[in-house]
Amino acid sequence: MRPADLIRQKQNGRTITILTAWDSLSAALVEAAGADAVLVGDSLAMVALGHATTLPVTLDQMRHHTLAVSRGFAAAPSKQPLLICDLPFLSYQCGADLAVQAAGTLLKETPAAAVKLEGAEAEVLAVIDRLVRMGIPVMGHLGLTPQAVHRLGYRRQAEDPVSQERLLTQAIALEQAGCFALVLEHVPSALAREVRRRLLIPVIGIGAGDDCDGQIRVTADLLGLTEQQPPFSPALIPGQQLFVEALRTWIAAQTPTTTPPPATPDY
């Protein structure tokens, strides 16, 4: 799977499905489930590394986890899901040169075929233009952008007409800068529908309603493995509870059923 294949899926009216992975086991699960693409998201900072936000994860950690994810794929390379890697905080906000180096490192040293970054400020658009001209496929991300949590929080975005018009303008700018797809997170469904109507590239929703070209979810949320569930991504199973109960069953089975005989001294 390549970035151009996602565009063809939009053109053919086929819904795109993207799930996150953070190690070889989670990658094997989402590949077996049939996801079109796998995102090694900076959410692994919270899911795998125990941080409270996505901000602390480093480029080297993203590279490490992307390699681990790639080892979990069982299919031949041409049949594997599209592998996308998040550019972590401060790997692209400090200029195009640093961004090219960061994205180039990920694509050179891992099997990732694309990177994702957040925002559409003038500086970010310049970075995207540079990356695309260097041959690096880029997925955009608007709405709730976790790397801006200290400024925007985790609340729903673009709820008033002015901010909705701004987001639509940003989405068009991202397409013009060369993005092959756009993630819209936690925005009104009517806005996502209009963005989808205006763009030729796929619009992938998470908390943006059903009228998108595809959907993306954090796998740990769907499996019920996280302590706090996002309101737009309810768990499909009580995974944490099931796993704890299974482990407790094993631990209980190790308790001796009879009292051992008293120890005999060696003297």
UniProtKB/Swiss-Prot annotation:
It catalyses: 3-methyl-2-oxobutanoate + (6R)-5,10-methylene-5,6,7,8-tetrahydrofolate + H2O = 2-dehydropantoate + (6S)-5,6,7,8-tetrahydrofolate. Pfam families: Pantoate_transf (PF02548). Its EC number is 2.1.2.11. It is an enzyme of class 2 (transferase). GO terms for molecular function: 3-methyl-2-oxobutanoate hydroxymethyltransferase activity; magnesium ion binding. Its cofactor is Mg(2+). Keywords: Cytoplasm, Magnesium, Metal-binding, Pantothenate biosynthesis, Transferase. InterPro entries: Pantoate_hydroxy_MeTrfase (IPR003700), Pyrv/PenolPyrv_kinase-like_dom (IPR015813), Pyrv_kinase-like_dom_sf (IPR040442). The active site is at E185 (proton acceptor). One of its GO terms (biological process) is pantothenate biosynthetic process. Gene3D superfamilies: Phosphoenolpyruvate-binding domains. 3-methyl-2-oxobutanoate binds at D42, S43, D86, K116. Mg(2+) binds at D42, D86, E118. Pathway: Cofactor biosynthesis; (R)-pantothenate biosynthesis; (R)-pantoate from 3-methyl-2-oxobutanoate: step 1/2. GO terms for cellular component: cytoplasm. The keyword Electron transport does not apply. It is found in: Cytoplasm. Binds 1 Mg(2+) ion per subunit. Catalyzes the reversible reaction in which hydroxymethyl group from 5,10-methylenetetrahydrofolate is transferred onto alpha-ketoisovalerate to form ketopantoate. Homodecamer; pentamer of dimers. Belongs to the PanB family. This is 3-methyl-2-oxobutanoate hydroxymethyltransferase. It comes from Parasynechococcus marenigrum (strain WH8102). The gene is panB.
